[in-house]
């Protein structure tokens, strides 16, 4: 009799676990039913993440999508600590400097801005009144603040926030000299943490990631060809120096940073109020009181 009760208890616990797994509310937009989506927006307090990657060459040893893969890994783990809805894969950003490399997908400036605007508009129409663009691509660091600034051009009933980067972590192993901007030690370490099966460490030295220094200009002078002039192989640094341990430290720091950002944004009640105030005053600038 006792054995029978034990069997019943085990079956009950297993069944309960299966039901619990089935009823756990996903954070991924594309995995939610229409009914569950309504619940998810309420649980997220209208806060939704738009992880922003890119499709480009990453040295001779990594795939084309680390920026997208890593930022989605980070956001998917961050929302386990602070719930928010995650928009599906998005990679329609700025990558003109890599158009000469196989596999790069570079959309026109007009499409980049228009598609991003329509995407955030549609997110807001579906209840995302706080849209958090989590940037995973260095080439977007001018595009995204500019896009956020353009939200002041006309009224919106939602706020766009842009989050990128994380606090520096302690270096694991010896310090390496030279720039480490793209597909080098840092980014390769992150991939060894998030998607190690996609990294070919034996190929990391097949090309040079050294700065070629082909244009001599003052630091405060900018030209669009600067990246190609310095890193024509679209590789900056030394991927062979990467370690999973460094990746674990960096990725965890990134996750923690995104968690803090989500919490701060959920608590932010002022940005939308001030945005609406600004819209109103901008219609009557001569009435603005000093």
Task: Label each region the model flagged.
Residues 21-110, 114-130, 138-290:
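Extended, histidine- and acidic-residue-enriched regions that form the cofactor-binding/catalytic faces
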Residues 1-7:
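Bacterial N-terminal signal peptides that target proteins for export
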Residues 7-16:
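Bacterial N-terminal signal peptides
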Residues 1, 16-21:
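Short, low-complexity disordered leader/linker segments with a strong preference
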């Amino acid at each position: 009799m006792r054995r029978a009760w034990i069997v019943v208890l085990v079956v009950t616990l297993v069944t309960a676990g299966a039901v619990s797994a089935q009823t756990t509310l996903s954070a991924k937009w594309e995995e939610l039913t229409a009914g569950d989506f309504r619940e998810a927006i309420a649980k997220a307090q209208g806060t939704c993440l738009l992880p922003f990657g890119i499709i480009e060459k990453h040295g001779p040893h990594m795939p084309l999508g680390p920026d997208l893969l890593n930022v989605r890994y980070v956001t998917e783990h961050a929302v386990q600590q602070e719930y928010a809805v995650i928009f599906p894969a998005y990679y329609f950003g700025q990558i003109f400097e890599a158009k000469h490399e196989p596999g790069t997908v570079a959309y026109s400036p007009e499409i980049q801005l228009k598609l991003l605007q329509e995407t955030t508009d549609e997110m807001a129409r579906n209840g995302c009144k706080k849209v958090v663009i989590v940037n995973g691509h260095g080439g977007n660091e001018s595009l995204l603040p500019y896009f956020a600034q353009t939200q002041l051009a006309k009224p919106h009933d939602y706020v766009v926030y842009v989050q990128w980067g994380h606090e520096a972590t302690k270096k694991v192993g010896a310090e390496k000299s030279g720039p480490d901007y793209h597909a080098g030690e840092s980014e390769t370490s992150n991939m060894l943490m998030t998607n190690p099966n996609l990294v070919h460490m034996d190929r990391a030295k097949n090309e040079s990631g050294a700065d070629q220094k082909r244009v001599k200009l003052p630091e405060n002078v900018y030209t669009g060809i600067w990246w190609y002039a310095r890193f024509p192989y679209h590789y900056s640094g030394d991927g062979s120096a990467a370690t999973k341990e460094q990746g674990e430290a960096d990725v965890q720091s990134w996750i923690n940073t995104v968690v803090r950002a989500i919490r701060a944004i959920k608590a932010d009640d002022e940005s939308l109020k001030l945005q609406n105030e600004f819209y109103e005053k901008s219609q009557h600038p001569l009435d603005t009181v000093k």
